[in-house]
């Protein structure tokens, strides 16, 4: 069994459901410390974070390449639906099964082993290697990567390159990498009416009826046309609640939850202003609370994307696709202190599902791609 596969299994065996790290970072820290990394634990409200860095011969003047990832996994769902226990690594039909196999314990193991091989081959490497690891990516993400980024900002620390080990591939390893992500902004809208008997609508104000025309306009709105890198901004309703459950009561209020996934073609302030303008146009009595989960970020083609594309082609023969589709990731926080952030990891077809798995044939090539990038950028 390869060192990468063995470490992957060791990490999968830890039931590290958010925010419980279950000592995964301790396993990583022991191996990184043996390589000469300075390892620092950053704890926050039950979340465990790791910042580990190994400087090269250029010291602080050298380029710094960081790997960012998370040790936490999503809950398993019904255990009886799993073919084998989710935290007992199992091999079947050329696949390794277990919660976190694809998202993202294989990536964690691959970069640790890549760093070990790189340091052994290049003991006098010029640039620096760092790990930014959290146990709060799958949850609220309020005490994880963002806290480490804030700490690094306070120290004036800057990263030159960052690879986030998210499972970006689809059918084959390396067919897709993410060089950006859309922003995410949610709204909690309460439209006020007047409760009353449904037989006497003239004595009440039905908030659902009041909201409906504005809702139709919001759903039909073209927020932007996107751009070269991003699809158009989308607006979607996630929840609509009103009423007591009775058939003869007009509700006193209607509650709407919605979400924007927005590109760099729009701004937070601009989208908020347009929503308020539509609601005000329909003369609604409302309150609206906004939550911005992350801003869009984009890494144009440059040293990191070139190195990653070259490494993927050399290892797999594939020409990779740069993409900004999908949900948010911790890359949105890291982009504040790093001009080049790209996400790359194994295929994502089974993530967050029963019987999550990774094809074993992808494990060593993933490690090799990571090692090739280290060699190209900081050796």
Swiss-Prot record:
Binding site for Zn(2+) 2: 103, 138, 352
Record keywords: Amino-acid biosynthesis, Cobalt, Diaminopimelate biosynthesis, Hydrolase, Lysine biosynthesis, Metal-binding, Zinc
Gene Ontology BP annotations: diaminopimelate biosynthetic process; L-arginine biosynthetic process; lysine biosynthetic process via diaminopimelate
Binding positions (Zn(2+) 1): 70, 103, 166
Cofactor(s) essential for the protein: Zn(2+); Co(2+)
Cofactor-binding details, from the entry: Binds 2 Zn(2+) or Co(2+) ions per subunit.
Keyword Nucleotide-binding: no
CDD domains: M20_DapE_proteobac (cd03891)
InterPro entries, A to Z: ArgE/DapE_CS (IPR001261), Bact_exopeptidase_dim_dom (IPR036264), DapE_proteobac (IPR005941), Peptidase_M20 (IPR002933), Peptidase_M20_dimer (IPR011650), Peptidase_M20A (IPR050072)
EC number: 3.5.1.18
Catalytic activity entry: N-succinyl-(2S,6S)-2,6-diaminopimelate + H2O = (2S,6S)-2,6-diaminopimelate + succinate
A GO molecular function held by the record: cobalt ion binding
Pathway info: Amino-acid biosynthesis; L-lysine biosynthesis via DAP pathway; LL-2,6-diaminopimelate from (S)-tetrahydrodipicolinate (succinylase route): step 3/3
PROSITE patterns from the UniProt entry: ARGE_DAPE_CPG2_1
Catalytic residues (UniProt): 72, 137 (proton acceptor)
Similarity section: Belongs to the peptidase M20A family. DapE subfamily.
Subunit and interaction comment: Homodimer.
Purpose: Catalyzes the hydrolysis of N-succinyl-L,L-diaminopimelic acid (SDAP), forming succinate and LL-2,6-diaminopimelate (DAP), an intermediate involved in the bacterial biosynthesis of lysine and meso-diaminopimelic acid, an essential component of bacterial cell walls.
HAMAP family tied to this protein: DapE (MF_01690)
Designated name of the protein: Succinyl-diaminopimelate desuccinylase
Species per Swiss-Prot/TrEMBL record: Burkholderia multivorans (strain ATCC 17616 / 249)
């Amino acid at each position: 069994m390869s060192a990468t596969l063995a470490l992957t299994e060791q990490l999968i065996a830890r039931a590290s459901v958010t925010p419980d790290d279950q000592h995964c970072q301790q396993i990583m820290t022991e191996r990184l410390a043996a390589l000469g990394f300075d390892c620092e634990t950053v704890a926050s409200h039950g979340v465990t974070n790791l910042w580990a860095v190994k400087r090269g011969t250029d010291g602080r003047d050298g380029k710094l390449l960081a790997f960012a990832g998370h040790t936490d996994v999503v809950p398993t769902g019904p255990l009886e639906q799993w073919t084998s226990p989710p935290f007992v690594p199992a091999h079947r039909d050329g696949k390794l099964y277990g919660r976190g196999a694809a998202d993202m314990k294989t990536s964690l193991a691959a970069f640790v082993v890549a760093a070990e091989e790189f340091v052994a081959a290049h003991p006098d490497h010029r640039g620096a290697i760092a790990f930014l690891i959290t146990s709060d990516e799958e949850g609220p993400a309020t005490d994880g990567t963002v806290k480490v980024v804030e700490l690094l900002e306070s120290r004036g620390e800057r990263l030159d390159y960052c690879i986030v080990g998210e499972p970006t591939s689809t059918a084959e390893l390396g067919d897709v990498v993410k060089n950006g992500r859309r922003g995410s902004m949610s709204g909690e809208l309460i439209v006020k009416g007047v409760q009353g008997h449904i037989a006497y609508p003239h004595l009440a104000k039905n908030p659902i009826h009041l909201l409906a025309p504005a809702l139709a306009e919001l759903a039909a709105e073209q927020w932007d046309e996107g751009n070269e890198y991003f699809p158009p901004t989308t607006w979607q309703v996630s929840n609509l609640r009103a009423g007591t459950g009775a058939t003869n009561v007009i509700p006193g209020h209607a509650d709407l939850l919605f979400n924007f996934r927005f590109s760099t073609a729009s701004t937070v302030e601009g989208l908020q202003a347009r929503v308020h303008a539509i609601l005000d146009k329909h003369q609604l009595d409302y309150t609206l609370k906004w939550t911005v989960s992350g801003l869009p970020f984009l890494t144009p083609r440059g040293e990191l994307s070139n190195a990653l594309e070259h490494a993927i082609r050399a290892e797999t023969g594939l020409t990779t696709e740069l993409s900004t589709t999908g949900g948010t990731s911790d890359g949105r926080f890291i982009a504040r202190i790093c001009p080049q952030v790209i996400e790359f990891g194994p295929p994502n077809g089974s993530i967050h599902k029963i019987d999550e798995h990774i094809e074993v044939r992808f494990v060593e090539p993933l490690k090799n791609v990571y090692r090739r990038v280290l060699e190209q950028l900081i050796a």
